[in-house]
Amino acid sequence: MPYIPHTPNDTKEMLTAVGAQDIQDLFDEIPASLQYAGFQSIPAGINEMEMLKEAQNQAQKNRNGICFIGAGCYEHHIPAAVWDIASRGEFLTAYTPYQAEASQGTLQLLYEYQTMICELTGMEVSNASMYDGATALAEAVLMAVRLNKHSKTNRVLITGTVHPFYRETIETIVRNQHIEVITLPFDEQQGITDFGSLNQYTGEDITALVIAQPNFFGCLEQVDKMTSWAHHNKTISVACVNPTSLALLKPPCSWGEHGVEIVCGEGQPLGSPMASGGPYFGFLSTRMAHVRQMPGRIIGRTVDKDGKTGFSLTLQAREQHIRRAKATSNICTNQGLLVTAATIYMSLLGPEGLSQVATQCHQNTHELITALTQIEGVELAFKAPFFHEALIKLNQPVQSVLQQLADAGIAGGYAPEQHYPQLANTLLVCATEVRSAEDIAKYAKTLKTIMSKRGA
């Protein structure tokens, strides 16, 4: 156990104090059969220069391809100022600012983040973030069950077009909560929820309805019809949305006749790098009437005894603070650092900048789909309108195509067949604002070459 502060004399003094001859004596009660012998083969440590060289050698093994993968994780341009500011010592922590008098800067930033999320979603109150989009949706389902006092069944309808990983997370979290999750089928021609399958539950006791917009396939759901159905059926409506899309699409507060009750989603597009899958953050917002059922924590603005504006942790009904059975959530912290980056990102871009990003994403994906569907053997899988990703169907094995694209330096998309067997040989592709016309042309040219080999 060599720690840098421990000099040989320090180690000898401590061993003498406990009556041991050497370090190994500290483990003499562990049978030799249980002790790992491989530690002896671990090489000696290296110096900083050698370590940097080794890191560079390992980094060179990475393949930096052109990315057309979406499926819940999106490559967006992040202004350099975002992480320059977020990495300042005053902000560089993911932990909770419990000591309000010493954390006004962090608390104000979190308060401003909540305000921005409310402006995006059109809701009245937001919490200070969740772990990621999947857990945010799972917590939204639990919140909906608590809110719906009319329901006695705890049955939750989830559209089959919700991200499959999100649905798996929901199943895991609610499994022991006496909640029944029912997955609605989707229209395999349109790529959106089959409204007829939802209509079959009219008049039945349904606790909550989960709607994704855009859905996993990038298609735009009939959110007005579905939200109005939920309202008339006394069902709590939960929207799972992409925050980038909210700069262009109708906000969830305006869906249907009365809007949704809860809005949540993945915040990664707002200034967080893809980073091999995380860390990310989730957002959740709702109406003020439901604030005491909201999970996580909420930052509020108040005044001190001198009348000066201040910020504090206003609500945090978590199992750390109250009886576990009465808590709204077991989430005990928040993704403060990622939220910091998101707040800076949204502040730098502003409403107009976010709208430009969303518009460019939409245009690039349409240009990509136009170019790809001109190739023989490639067609658009669904007819419904899409935002910034879409599903294409290939007449060749998708895994082989993906491998050949990868060999050409292109991350060609995500194959959903592992979650949807009926969608064999389809590919979910995405083109955000960072993809240039040259990138799209290269993808189309490479795919055309690959598809032409079939007849050779």
From Swiss-Prot:
Enzyme class: oxidoreductase
Keywords of the record: Oxidoreductase
Disulphide linkage map: none
GO molecular function: glycine dehydrogenase (decarboxylating) activity
Highest taxon of the lineage: Bacteria
Statement: the UniProt record of this protein carries the keyword Transmembrane: no
Family assignment from sequence similarity: Belongs to the GcvP family. N-terminal subunit subfamily.
Annotated InterPro entries: GcvPA (IPR023010), GDC-P_N (IPR049315), GDC_P (IPR020581), PyrdxlP-dep_Trfase (IPR015424), PyrdxlP-dep_Trfase_major (IPR015421), PyrdxlP-dep_Trfase_small (IPR015422)
CDD domains, alphabetized: GDC-P
Name of the protein described by the UniProt record: Probable glycine dehydrogenase (decarboxylating) subunit 1
EC number, as in UniProt: 1.4.4.2
Biological role: The glycine cleavage system catalyzes the degradation of glycine. The P protein binds the alpha-amino group of glycine through its pyridoxal phosphate cofactor; CO(2) is released and the remaining methylamine moiety is then transferred to the lipoamide cofactor of the H protein.
Catalytic activity entry: N(6)-[(R)-lipoyl]-L-lysyl-[glycine-cleavage complex H protein] + glycine + H(+) = N(6)-[(R)-S(8)-aminomethyldihydrolipoyl]-L-lysyl-[glycine-cleavage complex H protein] + CO2
Annotated NCBIfam families: PRK00451.1
Gene Ontology annotations of biological process type: glycine decarboxylation via glycine cleavage system; nucleoside metabolic process
